[in-house]
């Protein structure tokens, strides 16, 4: 009998856990190390999503374990009006490594919280309240962040915040605007903002965007799009908020994804990867915006704002990423992963597209590669076969597209682990077809 079949465990889970989306895997995870998690039977499962797209250093990295132990023993939590060295040091480090002009940081706990703080700041500083995002976005499950999230969770909970607008994200695999046989995503952006201008009451405060929309199906903003988006914002007195929860801290082959585009947002939000799986988030903005927000009485007082222990973790994460060259490694290992996925694409017609950047890649599963008809159900079947073989994969499927695997192994992943994951994925596809 499998130790995962613990009747008491599953009875208690059914009776006492609130279900918050999706279904639970039918196994009990007992420990994790590096690129693997281990169930109650000791079976190793290769984690190709870094937990919740967060554990960029792998699970239980020894230096992170060490710093947690150190600060749990001497300085864990403080009254929010007190400061500690890890907090000031992390804010200083973030100012030094983010694009020039982003000089002041607020340290928080989760991605939703950081986006909430950013949107609140944008509304206060601009004196306006309308927020625009992408129709395939995910920015969090709290108030303003949920109102700016369009990929899921909008039904059954009453109205979103007044002034919430969405435009389609540019999707090169499934283009909507074509000119002379080519996708004209800048014309699409022009048209989208024309519609926004017609709906706006003149109170456009900010646009919030992910450089690569992860929950939206690994939709990468094409070259030139982010710069054009920034110009749209500037022309309307809007702030540009970039949510780099998943793309930040080296995952895409630059420290921050916006650096590829040479675009500096007005507010940058970080979470997931900043704490490498621990609850740490931040917003980073300019001195001018922070000064104006402070003058206007900006308030974002939370229980765990400026907590020293997670700040110390964030510092150590950045130390390891920079010391071990993990940003460059994301490019090298990402190229290996991409080549392997393209090889699988040659073997299996159900793979319609391979996309993404660095170690954040997407694989879209289709019924017909020529027509790009979505293959409803096949992606979920492949996912189940992956888990049966010992590979943890995550798939998302929005209306109008096939299931998309979001592949995001740790930046510390080895060549052998990349190759193992590719082999298991190939076997899973064979079983599912």
Swiss-Prot record:
Top-tier EC class: lyase
Keyword Lyase attributed: yes
Gene3D superfamilies attached to this UniProt entry: Aspartate Aminotransferase, domain 1 (3.90.1150.10), Type I PLP-dependent aspartate aminotransferase-like (Major domain) (3.40.640.10)
GO molecular function: 2,2-dialkylglycine decarboxylase (pyruvate) activity; pyridoxal phosphate binding; transaminase activity
Disulfides per UniProt: none
Enzyme Commission no: 4.1.1.64
Cofactor(s) required for function per UniProt: pyridoxal 5'-phosphate
Keyword terms, alphabetized: Decarboxylase, Lyase, Pyridoxal phosphate
N6-(pyridoxal phosphate)lysine: residues bearing it: 272
Record's catalysed reaction(s): 2,2-dialkylglycine + pyruvate + H(+) = dialkyl ketone + L-alanine + CO2
Additional observations: The enzyme may have evolved to use the rare dialkylglycines of cosmic origin, or it may be part of a metabolic pathway for breaking down cytotoxic peptides and the constituent amino acids.
UniProt record similarity statement: Belongs to the class-III pyridoxal-phosphate-dependent aminotransferase family.
Record text on subunit structure and interactions: Homotetramer.
Reported function: The dialkylglycine decarboxylase is of interest because it normally catalyzes both decarboxylation and amino transfer. It may be more properly described as a decarboxylating aminotransferase rather than an aminotransferring decarboxylase.
Protein name stated in the entry: 2,2-dialkylglycine decarboxylase
Lineage: Bacteria, Pseudomonadati, Pseudomonadota, Betaproteobacteria, Burkholderiales
């Amino acid at each position: 009998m499998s130790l995962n079949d613990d009747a008491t465990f599953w009875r208690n889970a059914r009776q006492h856990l609130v279900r918050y989306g999706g279904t639970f895997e039918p196994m009990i995870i007992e420990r994790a190390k590096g690129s693997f998690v281990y169930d109650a039977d000791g079976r190793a499962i290769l984690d190709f999503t870094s937990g919740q797209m967060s554990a960029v250093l792998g699970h239980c990295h020894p230096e992170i374990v060490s710093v947690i132990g150190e600060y749990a023993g001497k300085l864990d939590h403080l009254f929010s009006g007190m400061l500690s060295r890890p907090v000031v040091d992390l804010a200083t480090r973030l100012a030094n490594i983010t694009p020039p002009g982003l000089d002041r940081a607020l340290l928080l706990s989760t991605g939703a919280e950081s986006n909430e703080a950013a949107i609140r700041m944008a509304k206060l500083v601009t004196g306006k309240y309308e927020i625009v995002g992408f129709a395939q976005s995910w920015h969090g499950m709290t108030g303003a962040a949920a109102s700016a999230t369009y990929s899921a969770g909008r039904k059954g909970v009453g109205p979103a915040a007044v002034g919430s607008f969405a435009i389609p994200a540019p999707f090169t695999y499934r283009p909507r605007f074509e000119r002379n046989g080519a996708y004209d995503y800048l014309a699409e952006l022009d048209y989208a903002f024309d519609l926004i201008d017609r709906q706006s009451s003149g109170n456009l405060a900010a646009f919030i965007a992910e450089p690569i929309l992860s929950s939206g199906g690994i939709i990468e903003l094409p070259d030139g799009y982010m710069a054009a988006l920034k110009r749209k914002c500037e022309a309307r007195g809007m702030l540009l908020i970039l949510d780099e929860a998943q793309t930040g801290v080296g995952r895409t082959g630059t420290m921050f994804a916006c650096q590829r585009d040479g675009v500096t947002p007005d507010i940058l939000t970080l979470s997931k990867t900043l704490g490498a799986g621990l609850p740490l988030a931040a917003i980073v903005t300019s001195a001018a915006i922070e000064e104006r927000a402070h003058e206007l009485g900006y308030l974002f007082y939370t229980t765990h704002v400026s907590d020293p222990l997670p700040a110390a973790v964030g510092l150590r994460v950045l130390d390891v990423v920079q010391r071990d060259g993990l940003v460059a490694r994301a490019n090298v290992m990402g190229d290996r992963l991409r080549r392997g996925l393209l090889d699988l694409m040659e073997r299996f017609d159900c793979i319609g597209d391979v996309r993404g950047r660095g170690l954040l890649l997407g694989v879209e599963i289709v019924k017909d590669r020529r027509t790009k008809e979505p293959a409803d159900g096949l992606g979920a079947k492949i996912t189940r076969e992956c888990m049966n073989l010992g590979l943890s994969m995550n798939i998302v499927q929005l209306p109008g597209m096939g299931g998309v695997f979001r592949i995001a192994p740790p930046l510390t992943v080895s060549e052998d682990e990349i190759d193992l994951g590719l082999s298991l994925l190939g076997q899973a596809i064979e079983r599912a077809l």
